[in-house]
């Protein structure tokens, strides 16, 4: 799915992201795949989209995914995604984080749910080889169809920010703390201050 995510959304000129951006759905489109949990999740997020764009977002997303699943993903796009991830894998550059720590965290992605396979997320080289062999037989197009188009476990979540909400919450908390402090005697306040130094 990381390969698909790269091809469909992350790579320069990625077709699904481009279609959503061309339709001016939100200010940016982001996607992610999280397989470090019991039930892996693939997400597509339209940042700062308007409420009335929800149906259009879903329609464009599904239409473009269906078109790509039917017509096929260009081989060079898949190979470019493989090259990108293989380079990252071989380079093993985790920035300021130690390699051992990052490898340990990667192991948890599978080890937490299957104690027989702690190294599955580290032994990626074999998987790259197997997946490269699948490029020609429609494997990736079938993944799109089965898991992104025909999946009955998908959901649409619209998050609506409320302007000034944090200020309201901060004021409520300040009022609550003031009321608590006012309920204490001077001696209780001093004791509390001493205990929390």
Describe the role of every protein-language-model region.
Residues 1-13, 43, 98-117, 121, ...:
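His/Glu-based metal-binding/catalytic segments typifying zinc-dependent metallopeptidases
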Residues 1, 55-56, 167-172:
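Short conserved micro-motifs at the rims of enzyme active sites and ligand-binding pockets
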Residues 7-11, 23-24, 147:
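Generic structural signal for hydrophobic core residues of well-folded globular domains
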Residues 17-133, 152-162:
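M16 family metallopeptidases and their MPP-like homologs
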Residues 120-197:
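Segments forming glycine/polar-rich beta-alpha architectures that bind adenosine-containing cofactors
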């Amino acid at each position: 799915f990381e390969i698909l995510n790269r091809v469909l959304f992350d790579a320069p000129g990625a077709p699904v992201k481009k279609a959503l951006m061309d339709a001016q759905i939100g200010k940016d489109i982001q996607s992610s795949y999280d397989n470090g949990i019991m039930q892996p999740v693939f997400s597509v997020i339209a940042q700062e989209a308007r409420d009335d764009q929800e149906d259009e977002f879903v329609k464009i997303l599904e239409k473009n995914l269906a078109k790509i699943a039917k017509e096929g993903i260009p081989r060079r796009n898949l190979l470019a995604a493989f090259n990108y991830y293989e380079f990252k894998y071989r380079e093993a550059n985790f920035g300021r984080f130690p390699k051992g720590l990052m490898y340990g965290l990667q192991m948890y992605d599978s080890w937490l749910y299957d104690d027989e396979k702690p190294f599955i997320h580290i032994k990626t080289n074999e998987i790259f080889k197997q997946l490269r062999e699948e490029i020609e037989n429609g494997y990736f197009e079938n993944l799109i169809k089965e898991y992104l188009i025909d999946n009955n476990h998908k959901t649409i979540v619209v998050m609506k920010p409320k302007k000034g909400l944090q200020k309201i919450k901060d004021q409520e908390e300040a009022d609550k703390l003031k009321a608590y402090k006012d309920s204490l005697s001077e001696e209780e306040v001093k004791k509390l201050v001493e205990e929390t130094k």
